[in-house]
Amino acid sequence: MQLSDFDFDLPERLIATRPARPRTAARLLLAEGDRIEDRHVRDLVGIFRPGDRLVLNNTRVIPARLTGTRTRGEAEARVEVTLMEPAAAGGWRAMAKPLRKLKPGETIRFSDALSAEVAEKGETDLRLVFDRAGAAFDAALAEAGAMPLPPYIAARRAPDAQDDEDYQTVFARHAGAVAAPTASLHFDRPLLEALAARSVGFTEVTLHVGAGTFLPVKVEDVTTHRMHAEWGEVTEAAAAEIAATKAAGGRVIPVGTTALRLIESAAASGAIRPWRGETDIFIYPGYRFRVTDALMTNFHLPKSTLLMLVSALMGQERIRAIYDHAVRHDYRFFSYGDASLLIPGG
């Protein structure tokens, strides 16, 4: 299975840099079996069935992009930092520009209330130890940081105050992600209430999406790719809700690839169980899904692990046809783009 098998041509004009307004006005490509329909997210009320269960990732994106100053003698230099994940040894793993000029022991000052020491430096990242912890760190980070927009958006415009709302789901509660679970960005409170009134169930899980979600696949044989690890949790109550839905014949539908990867990790033994820890599950064609019946997700990058995941769910040829339709019909791609609802089998 070659990396080139997951390539496709995407016109740059289809890369969304702002979301649809309102959120539910985004377009929705409904692919059920061999059928494709062009709909909108607001139509989900008539698409989902009573007894369906949506699995939502309730992680909260932190303002992980920081701009600071490194002082060496009389000289000052600007440093751009993106937090990646908490480090096992304490502090945060982070990417920095310019990384090569930073040295262990140096201090980067981000604001009057927030500084960090370079504790360790690797080839591609470093470990920072901040001078604040707990609630004091959260408050200082909120003041000094900016939303960590994906590279394909950040290359086209700078983050602004609108992203603080746009790049956060309406049910975000547990801070720790440095990228949004973007399929969930399409939901607003009225849509959630309308779905609940139709007896569609909701289960919340937590997967703190890491910066590794944007890393390219660098091997041609995709089966040898190693995934980045991300921390997640499926509580006992969440596992019980999902198991009850399966037992009752309902469909379990993760909203986003992060929710899907998490519940499949929690069902590695065959049945969904409470689970907590780091997952590096890599789903590509040939994978046997254990609890997932369908998936709502945005449109993904060429040659990405997420494109491999949806190909595992729907089949490679089917995904090629779906993405060809999306490009020909001007669907908007990636984090702020439109959505798809993928239902295998039909």
UniProtKB/Swiss-Prot annotation:
GO CC annotations, alphabetized: cytoplasm
Catalysed reaction, written as an equation: 7-aminomethyl-7-carbaguanosine(34) in tRNA + S-adenosyl-L-methionine = epoxyqueuosine(34) in tRNA + adenine + L-methionine + 2 H(+)
Pfam families reported for this sequence: Queuosine_synth
Keywords in alphabetical order: Cytoplasm, Queuosine biosynthesis, S-adenosyl-L-methionine, Transferase
GO biological process, one term: queuosine biosynthetic process
Keyword 4Fe-4S: no
Keyword Cytoplasm: yes
InterPro entries, per the entry: QueA, QueA_dom1, QueA_dom2, QueA_sf
Subcellular location as annotated: Cytoplasm
Enzyme class: transferase
Recorded GO MF terms: S-adenosylmethionine:tRNA ribosyltransferase-isomerase activity
Described purpose of this protein according to its UniProt entry: Transfers and isomerizes the ribose moiety from AdoMet to the 7-aminomethyl group of 7-deazaguanine (preQ1-tRNA) to give epoxyqueuosine (oQ-tRNA).
Stated family: Belongs to the QueA family.
Subunit architecture: Monomer.
Protein name: S-adenosylmethionine:tRNA ribosyltransferase-isomerase
